[in-house]
């Protein structure tokens, strides 16, 4: 049964739990990138460090992993993963100027590239910190087809009398298709070896868990609109909550509420930059 439990979670703790869901396509990204023992890896948008910890165990004592995330509270959690070859720092894709040229073998951007406004500049900086022949692995929300949750929230907002969800803060304006991402990579000195769509399926216990997951990315970016109910009057919040629970009935299965996601996966090598 779909639950109406929408108790507030502490953002960092919710992010830590729910980023575990992102780990399965993070692991797929790592496999695509061919990370090996001894590699020096930079993860931009590491959150609470789930994927960075996984990578640190692969690269071993001769390698190192640096994770960047804008939220101090997320980095505090990441630093509890006391692996000697993993360093977690507060920072964003705009802060790569602090890193030395050619200081990494691999750069990872797992489920965060679609939130970057100046994507070309960020990719150019990623190229700069990579050695010649270094690899970049990206997973990002695809422009098309839409995630199930996007279709779902469009209907929820219409039924609650709030229009549709287009332009809401969680609908990123910076989503790309495969051709656009390939073009950006080539423009800053990368040669794409693979770019394409991959589907993923998630199961959720209740409405609150759906909301936590879908907005944990915004919380990770330090965006206070991660809890989209906060800006609505109580009456509107109740309407959205009821409409969401009603719509999710159609997605309820014996395994939980099923929602599908469509991600672009890209791997490229640095030719110049």
Residue ranges and their predicted role:
Residues 4, 22, 48-50, 174-273:
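Conserved Class I S-adenosyl-L-methionine
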Residues 54, 121-126:
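Short, conserved SAM-binding segment of the class I
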Residues 94-107:
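A short acidic, Gly/Pro-enriched loop at the edge of an enzyme's catalytic core
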């Amino acid at each position: 049964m779909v639950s109406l439990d929408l108790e507030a979670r502490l953002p960092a703790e919710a992010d830590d739990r729910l980023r575990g869901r992102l780990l399965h396509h993070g692991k797929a990204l790592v496999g695509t990138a061919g990370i090996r023992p001894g590699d020096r890896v930079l993860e931009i948008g590491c959150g609470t460090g789930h994927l960075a910890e996984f990578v640190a165990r692969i690269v071993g004592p001769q390698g190192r992993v640096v994770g960047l995330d804008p939220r101090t509270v997320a980095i505090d959690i990441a630093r509890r993963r006391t692996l000697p070859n993993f360093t977690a720092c507060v920072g964003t894709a705009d802060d790569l100027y602090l890193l030395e040229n050619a200081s990494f073998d691999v750069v990872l951007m797992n489920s965060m590239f679609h939130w970057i406004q100046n994507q070309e500049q960020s990719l150019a900086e990623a190229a700069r910190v990579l050695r010649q022949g270094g690899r970049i692995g990206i997973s990002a929300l695809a422009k098309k087809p839409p995630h199930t949750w996007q279709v779902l929230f469009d209907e929820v907002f219409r039924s609650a009398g709030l229009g549709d969800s287009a332009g809401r803060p969680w609908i990123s304006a910076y989503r790309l298709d495969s051709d656009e991402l390939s073009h950006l990579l080539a423009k800053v000195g990368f040669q794409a070896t693979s770019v394409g769509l991959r589907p993923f399926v998630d199961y959720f216990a209740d409405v609150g868990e759906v909301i936590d997951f879908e907005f944990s990315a915004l919380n990770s970016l330090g965006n206070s609109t991660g809890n989209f109910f906060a800006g609505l009057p109580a009456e509107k919040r109740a309407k959205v909550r009821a409409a969401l629970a009603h719509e999710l009935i159609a997605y309820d299965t014996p395994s939980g509420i099923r929602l599908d996601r469509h991600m672009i996966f890209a791997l490229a090598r640095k030719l110049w930059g």
